[in-house]
Amino acid sequence: MTDPTNAPALDENQIIAERRAKLAAIREAGVAFPNDFERRDYAGRLAHEHGDKSKEALEAEAVDVQLAGRMMLKRVMGKASFATLQDMSGRIQVYVSNDLTGLDAHEAFKRWDLGDFVGVSGTLFKTNKGELTIQAKSVRLLSKALRPLPEKFHGLADQEQKYRQRYLDLITNDDARSTFVRRSKIIQAIREFMTGHGFLEVETPMMHPIPGGAAAKPFVTHHNALDMELFLRIAPELYLKRLVVGGFEKVFEINRNFRNEGLSTRHNPEFTMMEFYEAYREYRYLMDFTEALIRHTAVAATGSTTISYQGSTIELGTPFDRLTIVEAVRKYHPEYTVEQLNDRDWLTAQFTAMKAKYREHDGLGGLQLTFFEETTEALLVQPTFIVDYPAEVSPLARRSDTQPEITERFELFITGREMANGFSELNDAEDQAERFMEQVRAKEAGDEEAMHYDADFIRALEHGLPPTGGCGIGIDRLVMLLTDSPSIRDVILFPQMRREA
């Protein structure tokens, strides 16, 4: 069914003025926004339960329904009209006529506009074309829309407008609604997996006296009553580890983090993370656990461990690759030798040649990581754990017992994006204090993302943290993967936008 209106397009201000006039008349006649309509049925459920029934079977059953929704389409044909109502579960056609609905009710219905919310009571039947339809016995206007829907109801053509006016995108775009329904299922599947493995879900502070738990710039705010500076959290890590110190040996949190950094297809300053910590585990176990969690979530969201992302087939059902930084660079760039990748001067010369930024005070490990990020990270399309990160860039991770210059840390990459970051936790209070001091020195040398010294966290560690493993998973990026979405803005209902011009 299509909208048959062939009249010239009206100026939006004129349309709004006409709708306001209609609303004024409705107010004059009685209650303009009633709230006593009792909805009993949903379009999707009716389609599921009755969509396959024959015309004759529906006529024999005479199924009474009472449904409400937004009017998306309308076709007036003299003594009868058809409309399509949309609710959260789907769409259904409605048939309004002088004979059954009543002349006055039908005439009022003709004056209603697309976008209005309508309540209908009637019986189900099928048209000659086999479309499930409600034959309306009564119709009521429940809420008047003053602004028109996007033209032709094909959705918003302007991508930025979709993000700024997400409500219109959700009204007119089935794919957008499907993405956010799937996002909810993904988060539900993660919760089920974690609680099924004995983890306790917790909530930790969103405002911190000291920013910590990640290398990032924080948002700063001020508490008036306490007259103190506070920071929106960049990560919950240090508070979650305090809980492990306190005896909660298996904890997780799904919540927002805030980082005062740039916008991109992969970055939003407000984003969702899941972090979990388990006592008496180390990073190799965490990789197995993270792999199993992502498989479980993929099946819950898509029904398969083989998914398509932007034209690439991603296989989540086979063991994820595990490579060191140097091994990964060598796998995708065999022209580079191990000797070159272990040569600080060679690496800095490469950065100069490729005009890439690097931190001059970094040691060999930091330079190798930067080289990996510049040359190889984007090539990790299939799931790959990069392991054994340098200690100098991992201030919260436990050092290797045999190679103290590296840590028991991994990052998981899929489609060239970091999906997870985990490690055996550093539980040596004295080593952690020294690592914090190294971060302080780096900050004093100009590294804005270096961490602060957190004396209270050191005090907690001094009470004893058992051997512990922890991992953080980017929920938004995981949702991007499992919904085939190219931008993080496509999976956040209201992403951060620049000011409108």
From Swiss-Prot:
Gene Ontology terms describing biological process: lysyl-tRNA aminoacylation
Cofactor binding mode and count: Binds 3 Mg(2+) ions per subunit.
Molecular function, one GO term: magnesium ion binding
Annotated residues for binding of Mg(2+) 2: E418
Catalyzed reaction equations: tRNA(Lys) + L-lysine + ATP = L-lysyl-tRNA(Lys) + AMP + diphosphate
Localization, UniProt: Cytoplasm
UniProt main location, coarse: cytoplasm
InterPro entries (alphabetical): Aa-tRNA-synt_II, aa-tRNA-synth_II, aa-tRNA-synth_II/BPL/LPL, Lys-tRNA-ligase_II, Lys-tRNA-ligase_II_N, Lys-tRNA-synth_II_C, NA-bd_OB-fold, NA-bd_OB_tRNA
Record's GO cellular component terms: cytosol
Broad class of enzyme this protein falls into: ligase
Domain of life: Bacteria
Protein's UniProt keywords contain Aminoacyl-tRNA synthetase: yes
Cofactor(s) it depends on: Mg(2+)
Pfam families: tRNA-synt_2 (PF00152), tRNA_anti-codon (PF01336)
Keywords associated with the record: Aminoacyl-tRNA synthetase, ATP-binding, Cytoplasm, Ligase, Magnesium, Metal-binding, Nucleotide-binding, Protein biosynthesis
Transmembrane segments: none
UniProt: Mg(2+) 1 binding residues: E411, E418
Enzyme Commission code: 6.1.1.6
HAMAP family named among the record's database cross-references: Lys_tRNA_synth_class2
Subunit: Homodimer.
Family: Belongs to the class-II aminoacyl-tRNA synthetase family.
Stated name of the protein: Lysine--tRNA ligase
Source organism of the structure: Thiobacillus denitrificans (strain ATCC 25259 / T1)
Gene that this sequence comes from: lysS
